[in-house]
């Protein structure tokens, strides 16, 4: 029986993280997803690389790479999906959040 994770980490996102980590030649890097106040809708998503997971962080391993989320951000990301896309608007990581009642045009800020 598999344990249901509170956030989905897509293959596309994990594969891109792996490529970026390989380019940096630092296998300790993890993708950290976080939520901060700001943006045009009240909250905004952030993505950064971190060499460590902090106590209490959610850790999701996929395709040999780790996604980490702090407990405060996790409450805003439950049932969401971290994905990666490349298109006419450029390449970016993004979050699909079913609990967001409003999102801005670029998709990086939201309201719950």
Curated annotation (Swiss-Prot):
Residues that bind iron-sulfur cluster: 40, 104, 106
One Pfam family hit: Fe-S_biosyn
Cofactor section: iron-sulfur cluster
Any one annotated GO CC term: cytosol
Keyword field contains Metal-binding: yes
Record keywords, A-Z: Iron, Iron-sulfur, Metal-binding
Keyword Nucleotide-binding: no
Any one GO biological process: iron-sulfur cluster assembly
InterPro entries from the UniProt entry: FeS_biogenesis, FeS_cluster_insertion, FeS_cluster_insertion_RrpA, HesB-like_dom_sf
Cofactor note text: Binds 1 iron-sulfur cluster per subunit.
HAMAP family, per the entry: Fe_S_insert_ErpA (MF_01380)
Subunit structure of this chain's protein: Homodimer.
NCBIfam families: iron-sulfur cluster assembly accessory protein, PRK13623.1
Purpose of the protein: Required for insertion of 4Fe-4S clusters for at least IspG.
PANTHER family named in the record: IRON-SULFUR CLUSTER ASSEMBLY 2 HOMOLOG, MITOCHONDRIAL
Family named by the database record: Belongs to the HesB/IscA family.
Protein name, as recorded: Iron-sulfur cluster insertion protein ErpA
Organism: Pseudoalteromonas translucida (strain TAC 125)
Lineage: Bacteria, Pseudomonadati, Pseudomonadota, Gammaproteobacteria, Alteromonadales
Gene that this polypeptide is encoded by: erpA
């Amino acid at each position: 029986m598999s344990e249901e994770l509170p956030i989905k980490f897509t293959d596309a996102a994990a594969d891109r993280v792996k490529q970026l980590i390989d380019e940096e030649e630092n296998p300790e890097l993890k993708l950290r997803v976080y939520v901060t106040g700001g943006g045009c809708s009240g909250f905004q998503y952030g993505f950064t690389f971190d060499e460590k997971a902090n106590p209490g962080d959610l850790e999701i391993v996929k395709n040999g790479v780790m996604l980490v989320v702090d407990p405060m951000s996790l409450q805003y990301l439950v049932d969401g999906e971290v994905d990666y896309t490349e298109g006419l608007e450029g390449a970016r990581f993004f979050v699909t959040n079913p609990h967001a009642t409003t999102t801005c045009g670029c998709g990086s800020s939201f309201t719950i």
